[in-house]
Structures are given as C-alpha cells and as structure tokens.
Amino acid sequence: MTVRLSEGAIESLSKGTEVNNPILQCVNIRKIDGGNGVSRFRVMMSDGLHTMSSFMLSTQLNPMAEQNQLATNCVCVLKRSVTNVLKDGRRVVVILDIEVLKSADQMPGKIGDPTPYVEGQSKAPSTAPAPTARPLQPQNGSDGSTYRPSAQSFGKKPMAAPNTPGGSSKVVPIASLNPYQSKWTIRARVTNKSAIRTWSNSRGDGKLFSMELVDESGEIRATGFNNEVDKFFSLIEQGKVFYISKGTLKIANKQFSSLKNDYEMTLNGETSIIPCEDSNDVPMLQCDFVSIADLESREKDTILDVIGVCKNAEDVARIMTKNSREVSKRNIQLIDMSGRVIQLTMWGSDAETFDGSGQPILAIKGARLSDFGGRSLSTLYSSTVMINPDIPEAYKLRGWYDKEGHALDGQSMTELRGPGGGGNTNWKTLAEVKNEHLGHGDKADYFSCIATIVYIRKENCLYQACPSKDCNKKVVDQQNGMFRCEKCDKEFPDFKYRLMLSANIADFGDNQWVTCFQDTAETLLGQNSSYLGQLKDTNEAAFDEVFQHANFNTFVFRNRVKLETYNDESRIKVTVVDAKPVDHREYSKRLIINIRKLAAQ
C-alpha cells in the first residue's frame, strides 16, 4: 500500500482549520516531565512540505509513546485533534486520537524535505507530477492501492460548530478539554451537586461546592470556591443542562473522584454559566457498574459505581467522629444478580432520608471499596446515590429480584458485627477452615479465629521499598547511594522498610501458615518496620529478641483464604487482614452462647 502525506495539513492545523484525517509523519518525539508527576509528550510532525513541533499528545495516549508505537519516522493518521491558542499567542495542536499506519521500523527515514512551518511564509505544494512522498510497500497482503485522506480543501474554513448564546466560542466535547486550551465552552448536564462546605484555619475561612458534569463524550468534576460559591451555587440545579466556559483545568485528583477524566475544572472570576433549554440529546448520567461478585478482585480504596437491590436496611445511627463531630450513618445490605451481598454504609443526609421499605434499587456512583470486615462499600462526599433510577440496569435488576432474587439469602462479602463490636458471624476454628474447604471456590473466603503465634520466620521479612507515599514497590540499590523504583521510574536517596511476615499460628485443634503485611505484621511484632530495619542493621541480637517475644501471644485474626496455583501446584494461601488483642470478656460471652446452643441440641 502506497501512502502519501497530506501536504498543506500542517498549515491548516496551525490556523485551526478543520482537516479531515490528515496523513502525517512523526519526525521527533520528546518526553516532558510534569511538575505534578504526569508526563506529557511533545511531537514534531511533518506533512511532507512543512514540519511543526507544537503537537502535544493527550495523556490518555501516553502509552503509545511509552511503548514505542508512536516513534520517530512512523506514519500516522490524525483522527481527532484540537488547536488551542495559548495566552502568549502560540498555538498547540493537542492529539486526541491517532492511528499508526506504518511503524518506525517499516520506514526508511524521513519523507521528502520538509521545512519548519512559519506563519505567513508557507510554500505552496509542488504541482510537478513527481510524487512528494516515497511510496510505502504493501503490507499484510494489501492490494497496493493508494491510501489517501478523505476529500478536503486545506484552505477552507471549518464547518460551523454549535455556539454559546453569547457566540464567543464554539461548543466542544468534555473529552477534548485540556489545560492547553484558552477558549472553550461545553454543554453539559449536572448529574451531582454537593452541599456547601466550609473551613477555617490559620490562613482564614473559606467555602466550596462541587458538581459533576456529563455530555455525550465524557464527564468532568467542577469545583467553585468562595466568590464562585456565592455567584453560582443557587443557579446550578442537579439534572439541568448549562453552557459553561472559561474554567481553569488541572490534573484530577483520583483519590477523591471516580470520574473517567484526566482533568478537573475550577470555576474562577471569568467563568460563565448559562442555562441551556435544548437539552434532550445530553445524557442523564454515565455509570460503569461493577458486579458485587467482582468487587472481590478490586483493590482496596478503589472508587467505583455499583447497583443493587436493598435487601435489608438498619436504622439510622448517630456516631461521633475523631474531630468530635456527630454524623448520621446507616448500613444497608445490597444484593445483585451474582447472588452476592455486600454492606453499604451511607452517611449524612443520605443516611437520614433513605427509606428501605419495598426493597428499592440503589445505584451509587463513586462509592469507596473497603476491606473492613471482608469487603464493604461506603458513600463519599462526592458520591451520587440514586434510588430506583430510570436506567436499563435498574429495570433488569428489578425484574430479576421480583422473580427469583427475593428468595435468595445470598452469600455475604461483609462480616456482620454484633453489638459491642465483638460478635462476628464467621468465626471458625482452624480445623473447620480445612474441613469445610474454605477458599476452594471461585472467590476468596473470609473467616475470624482466635489463635496463638507459634513461630515467625525472620528471614527475608523486611525489604527496602519506594519512599513515595502511595508506592510500596521494592527498590533496587544502584550502588551509588541512590535507590531506583521501577514502578515510579525514579531514583531516590533513601527508602522505607516494609514488612512481609510468614507466621505459623495454632488453636486447640490445628495450625496454619499465614502471611502478614505491614500493619498486621507490626501488630504481631509490637514494633514498627523502620525501627526493626535499624535493629537488623545495627543490633542483630535485639532484632532476634523482638521475634522471640512475639511467640506465644494470642490474637483475634481476621483472615482471607484462597486456593492459589503456582507452577501448576495448588495450595491454600491465608492472608491476615487484621489482628487484634483478645477481648476476653467478649470471647467468654461467645463461648457461653455456644455452650448453651450445644446443650439445647
């Protein structure tokens, strides 16, 4: 297949003129490290006539550069882009979608003799019959036909795009927003609007509110502070559609948002928000629901969307937080078509106003997954809770529950605790765990037991880990005073010690090897990993003594058990999720209850 570059496309893209699928060659690509930890890639492109270095790869396309799919000399079709004018007048073409037609190793080199594009000094495409691009060899059995971009005229003005009521800038999709744009307007529906939150500290007082916006291309979170709260809070209505322009865009903090967008918006003094009456084609919501059964395999603290039937709802309770603030909470058991049940904790006004009668359908956008008591969910300040939503997933779930789901008890993923925090419905002896083949199913099982530490292996119990806050990857000593983390792709002058213990625990009937990670390992040893690392390096005898003192101590263990396969050999792996000292009063109460049950048989 012969490919010709789209001569004149560089000039048109620079001027913001619409170009339909131009064929370009990557002349150079350079990684730019961002101050917030997110790297960007700057690309120089050629159309055979001109080159331009002000192409930027959108962050979602970074893997193409990191995996060398997009590399120097490869030939690409630019499927979607946006040209932004920076404050200093420079133009940047942000690549939103691109496809590699010929990889770099399939190309002999640069096509033609392009020169850097300078506005106002363009040279016209050659009218000579000689081709301006070297013919590319057919691949994958193609018929040798020429690949050309769709019919286009690079000098024409772009087609008219929808404008805002003020006519200041065209409406763009949310998915195309990025910090390099200076003029843009989106038309989006408000799917969630928070209450006003206030704060007071040494730097003064303040307030904020946030909202989640959606259009047909994607979603984004917007936050307003202080003056913008006064200006916009009363105007914004959940469910309504608005034209929004001139917000500040920055990298999104994924710790507090589950929205599928690399950026988030901050309202500022120049922001304009205008109601939109023509809103029928703007979607109501974007959710990516995860089955309750699949929550077993998700990482702790993941923010996700879930939908289920309210199988049971506890009464609302009032609790005191660490900062002496009283809040409302309500625990709800959700079941879905997987037959699994999980506990959802709702907070604040959601907990107070929820009515669980009639087993309503609950859809939660942005719930946090926890491993407290097995697996459980909790709503956040930013979560959206929908009761009996008008969406296909809700109707399908209602039909299933009314027909057959109501008769299921369901297998709970959450350990249900009784009054006082000491009760637990999944107490097992170690012999029962083996006799009942816990962990042999498709999903892991959780159980609690009271057991005594018999032995802890101290060999290889400590490792040098990345010092970054959210990374625990093992580092490699570079032998030059620096330590390299492959995950973060950085070198550090220091590291942190992490624990991974292998211990043998026993009760009156059996014993079991278990694995303990950082927090539970520190509980068992009674020392933190940093101190243990110092002892290991400076005082081996004191280090050994810590392990000796840990033996024959008894704890309440909460464990995860799963049959895992290594090199075609299957074995049970038990991981300690939590370890606490025994509350002998609660333990005695439970033993008395069990004795009475046995006596009544």
Swiss-Prot record:
Keyword entries, A-Z: DNA replication, DNA-binding, Metal-binding, Nucleus, Phosphoprotein, Zinc, Zinc-finger
Biased composition (Polar residues): 137-153
Modification type Phosphoserine: residues: 370
DNA-binding region: 184-268
One of the record's GO cellular component terms: nucleus
Compartments in which it is found: Nucleus; Nucleus, PML body
Annotated stretches, region: Disordered: 107-172
Keyword Metal-binding annotated: yes
SUPFAM superfamilies associated with the record: Nucleic acid-binding proteins
Keyword DNA-binding: yes
Highest taxon above the source species: Eukaryota
Segments forming a coiled coil: none
Principal localisation: nucleus
One BP annotation, GO: meiotic cell cycle
Amino acid composition bias (Low complexity), ranges on this chain: 124-135
Start-end of C4-type zinc fingers: 466-488
GO MF terms held by the record: damaged DNA binding; single-stranded DNA binding; single-stranded telomeric DNA binding; zinc ion binding
Role description: As part of the heterotrimeric replication protein A complex (RPA/RP-A), binds and stabilizes single-stranded DNA intermediates, that form during DNA replication or upon DNA stress. It prevents their reannealing and in parallel, recruits and activates different proteins and complexes involved in DNA metabolism. Thereby, it plays an essential role both in DNA replication and the cellular response to DNA damage.
Subunit structure of this chain's protein: Component of the heterotrimeric canonical replication protein A complex (RPA).
Family, similarity comment: Belongs to the replication factor A protein 1 family.
Protein name: Replication protein A 70 kDa DNA-binding subunit
